[in-house]
Structure formats: structure tokens, C-alpha cells
Swiss-Prot record:
Catalytic activity: an organic molecule + reduced [NADPH--hemoprotein reductase] + O2 = an alcohol + oxidized [NADPH--hemoprotein reductase] + H2O + H(+)
Ribosomal protein keyword on record: no
Protein name listed in UniProt: Cytochrome P450 2M1
Pfam assignment, any one: p450
Length: 499
């Protein structure tokens, strides 16, 4: 009887405790959350997670936008997340009220790597100072040094050579494209390219690959929601953190080597430029130019600049396999404008069709449907709702890239979406492939140069064909918790007839 009484008492205590937890959760921040935008009712502790596909959360957001409109709230566990959908609302938030929405939310996978340092995850003064420096450094690389264009042209030449070794045979282009894009970043960060079999180059490439594998995986999604719990379990996230740390150590070692022979009047690479800035501001107690920010800003160039650009190129060539007539039209324009010489950035304005194809690949691919999460920097009024300071905010870029009011054929791959009736390239205000506002991709200019020069240099020499008929090729990007990435594919690379 005593045992039964004890069990009954414990059971009742558990039930009461559970009810108390639910009531506390339901009333947590009730006053501050009372004017949040509407959204689906959350389940205690889990929020709206049971309704969400962790590999494609943007699909739920697109569905909810039809019901709740351009501003709504979802709950990731116990945290409210405000989603902003549609061109006008996104512009109003991230451009018109850009300062309020300019913060970077805590994204645990990235935060564990960065410890809060670097341009990608920081907010406020740190973000502004590092972003301004990065943009200016990349922009001025052509002054007294090899220009960005020359660096990309060199890698394009190496890529053509590498593809030539596989002509008339089956190849998966992923590694070749990752290597050439990775070496562009190496040339900027370290001042020189690496051979593909160099151990340090392979370390960096493996670190970037591991980083995005975790970001794109279910365990990465769970880590971002429950970091302390997931940290306690085995998984590839531990291996990823270890190899990324090795890459960070290598960057630090390279900085220490350069510091010994640094010419402050003529820095030769990104690291040296950062070191010069550190020396200039060494007596400023509020400076953001320190070792931690140097290493993480350099790492961010690899993390943000390698996978995104190489993935877009992979998707581009997959589209050429799927649509041979589009590939032929691009090659015709290449022959007419460039001929057999080396492609240059100046050629782009004379090649509206090719430019439209590249833009359409980015629009259709929709690489990052919600961008990297933002947060509001202070209590913010938006569309008659109250968003408390620190709340995570997601711009639903997908809602703009498939808006029929902005694009003629939003559900199809159609370069005409970026051409007028005369075949002239037409800019589109809804082209948010690089994000929008104060946190738009700082490497956009570099990415545009890479996409154009790599794409034209390769199609100038080669034609891509599939291992199966075009109608059987799936061009829909594979969804992951990070974004929409191209599917793995094999193809034939055939040498074109000399013109």
C-alpha cells in the first residue's frame, strides 16, 4: 500500500509539474509577445516544429504566407520567429527600416564556429566596420595589384584545362568547380593559388565541405534549435567543428608569417590588408580589427564564397544539359562577341542572353530561400505589429523570386524573365538572389565576375550533354535545412569545333 501511495503521489507530482511548465511557457513574455504578427498556434516546448519539414522549412513559410499575409510568426521550439514575405514587405523591412532589421540572429552552428567574431554573424558596430573594410578591400584589389578579374581569368584557364582532361568521358563536375572557386578565394586571402593536391588547400576545401554538410543536414537543423542537447550526442558535427578549427589555425599561422615581413604601404592580400588595419588602430580600445575578427572574416570568405558560387555553376551546367537549345544560344552569343579570345567582364553588357541565363539560373535555383537569419536591433513597430528587440526575423526571398507580378514565367526556367521584347537584358527589382538591404551578400560583385567568366570560358570550349535524355533529367534543386542545392549528376564534356 505504501509503495502504491508513493507511485500515485509521484505520478500526480509529475502531472502537476508538467501542467505548470506548460502554463509558464504559454505565459512567457506574454506582454511583449501580445502584438507579434499572427501565426499558427504553437505546441508547448516544440512550437510549430511538428508541421515543418526540417529539410525545407521555407515550404511551410510559403504556405503560411497565403493564410496570414506578408508578416507572420512561427515558433521554433520556444522561440518566436517573424517571417516577412513578398517584395514590398521585404523592401519595407530590410531597406526602409534597414537599421532596425540589420542584426544577425544567433545561428548556433555558425556561432559555435565563429564565437561571435567575423562579418557574417556579428551585429552593430562590429558588423558595419568589418563589412565596410571587406567591401573596400575587395574593391581596391585592382589598384597596384592583380585585379579580381585577372585572378578569376587565371582560374577559368585552369578549369578549362581540367575539363579538357575529361572530354568525351563521364565526369561529375562538382570537385572541379569547387577547386576553381576555392582557389579564387585563396588568391584573394593568401595572395596565391594552390595546386589542387596541396595538403593545406585540401584541408580548407574539406573544412568548407564539412561545414555545409552539417548546415544542410537534419542534425544541423536540430543543433540550431537545441544546441546544448545535440552537442552531447555523437555525430558529424563534432568532426566538422574540429576540421574547421584546423583551417582557422592555418589562417592564423599565415597571418603571423606575413606580419614579420609586412609592407604596410602595399599589402598583397586580404590578410595583409587586415593586418595593416590592425596596426593602424592598435591604440583604439574600441577597434574591431583584432585576430579573432581577422581569422573569422577570412574564413567567412571561404564559407560564404565557395559553396554558393560553385553550386550555382553546377546548377548552370545542369540547366545547359536539360535545355540544349539554350546552351546553343549561349554559345552562339559567345562566338559572336568573344570569339576565341579570353572572356572579360566588359563582355557581359554585350551579351544580354548569356547574362539573362545566369540570372535565371540563380532565380530558379533559389539557393537561400530565407537568407541567413536576421534579428531586430531594438523594439520595432512594423505593419502595426510589435517585434521585441532580439527577435529572429526571416526574409522569405522565395516569395519574391516566384512572384508572377515580377516574373513572366516564375514556375519555369525561362531566360525571357530577364529580357525585354527586343532581347535586351532587363533588370528586375525582385532579383533577391544575393539578399537585400544592409546584410545583402558582401561578395556579390565577386560572385558576378566568377559566374560570368567561368560560365563563358567553359562553354566557349565545351558542350555539356547528359548521361540520359534531357527529358529524364531532374533540375529541381535538392532541399536541405541550409537551402536549395543542385543535385549530384554525371555528364559528358565534349570539345567544341573550333570557330
Amino acid at each position: 500500500m505504501d509503495v502504491l501511495h508513493i507511485l500515485q503521489t509521484n505520478f500526480v507530482s509529475i502531472i502537476i509539474g508538467f501542467v505548470v511548465i506548460i502554463l509558464l511557457w504559454m505565459n512567457r513574455g506574454k506582454q511583449s509577445n501580445s502584438r507579434l504578427p499572427p501565426g499558427p498556434a504553437p505546441i508547448p516546448l516544440l512550437g510549430n516544429l511538428l508541421r515543418m519539414d526540417v529539410k525545407a522549412p521555407y515550404k511551410l513559410y510559403m504556405e503560411l504566407s497565403k493564410k496570414y499575409g506578408s508578416v507572420f510568426t512561427v515558433w521554433l521550439g520556444s522561440k518566436p520567429v517573424v517571417v516577412i514575405s513578398g517584395y514590398q514587405a521585404i523592401k519595407d523591412a530590410f531597406v526602409t527600416q534597414g537599421e532596425e532589421f540589420s542584426g544577425r540572429a544567433n545561428y548556433p552552428v555558425i556561432m559555435t564556429v565563429s564565437k561571435g567574431y567575423g562579418v557574417l554573424v556579428s551585429s552593430g558596430k562590429r558588423s558595419k566596420d568589418l563589412r565596410r573594410f571587406s567591401l573596400m578591400t575587395l574593391k581596391t584589389f585592382g589598384m597596384g595589384r592583380r585585379s579580381i578579374e585577372e585572378r578569376v581569368q587565371e582560374e577559368a584557364k585552369m578549369l578549362v584545362k581540367a575539363f579538357g582532361e575529361y572530354r568525351d568521358s563521364v565526369v561529375n563536375p562538382k570537385e572541379l568547380l569547387c577547386n576553381c572557386v576555392g582557389n579564387v578565394i585563396c588568391s584573394i586571402v593568401f595572395g596565391h593559388r594552390f595546386e589542387n593536391d596541396d595538403p593545406m588547400f585540401q584541408l580548407i576545401q574539406k573544412a568548407v565541405d564539412a561545414y555545409f554538410n552539417v548546415l544542410s543536414s537534419p542534425i544541423g537543423a536540430m543543433y540550431n534549435m537545441f544546441p546544448r542537447i545535440v552537442w552531447c550526442f555523437p555525430g558529424n558535427h563534432h568532426e566538422m567543428f574540429a576540421i574547421v578549427n584546423k583551417a582557422k589555425v592555418y589562417i592564423q599561422e599565415q597571418a603571423e608569417i606575413r606580419l614579420k615581413t609586412l609592407n604596410i604601404s602595399e599589402p598583397q592580400d586580404f590578410i595583409e590588408a587586415f593586418l595593416v588595419k590592425m596596426l593602424e588602430e592598435k591604440d583604439d580600445p574600441n577597434t574591431e580589427f583584432n585576430n579573432g575578427n581577422m581569422v573569422m572574416t577570412a574564413w567567412s570568405l571561404f564559407a560564404a564564397g565557395t559553396e554558393t558560387t560553385s553550386s550555382t555553376l553546377r546548377q548552370s551546367f545542369l540547366m545547359m544539359i536539360k535545355y540544349p537549345h539554350i546552351q546553343e544560344s549561349v554559345q552562339k552569343e559567345i562566338d559572336e562577341v568573344i570569339g576565341s579570345r579570353v572572356p572579360t567582364v566588359d563582355d557581359r553588357v554585350k551579351m544580354p542572353y548569356t547574362d539573362a541565363v545566369i540570372h535565371e539560373v540563380q532565380r530558379y535555383m533559389d539557393l537561400s530561400p530565407t537568407s541567413v537569419p536576421h534579428k531586430v536591433m531594438r523594439d520595432t513597430e512594423f505593419y502595426n505589429y510589435h517585434i521585441p528587440e532580439g527577435t529572429m526575423v526571416l526574409p522569405l526571398l522565395s516569395s519574391v523570386l516566384v512572384d508572377p507580378k515580377l516574373f513572366k514565367n516564375p514556375d519555369e526556367f525561362d531566360p525571357e524573365n530577364f529580357l525585354d521584347e527586343n532581347g535586351v537584358f532587363k533588370k528586375n527589382d525582385g532579383f533577391f538572389a544575393f539578399g537585400v538591404g544592409k546584410r545583402a551578400c558582401p561578395g556579390e560583385a565577386l560572385a558576378r565576375v566568377e559566374l560570368f567568366l567561368f560560365f563563358t570560358s567553359v562553354l566557349q570550349r565545351f558542350t555539356f550533354t547528359g548521361t540520359k535524355p534531357p527529358e529524364e533529367i531532374n533540375i529541381e534543386p535538392a532541399c536541405s535545412s541550409f537551402g536549395r542545392l543542385p543535385r549530384s549528376y554525371d555528364c559528358y564534356i565534349k570539345l567544341r569545333t573550333e570557330k
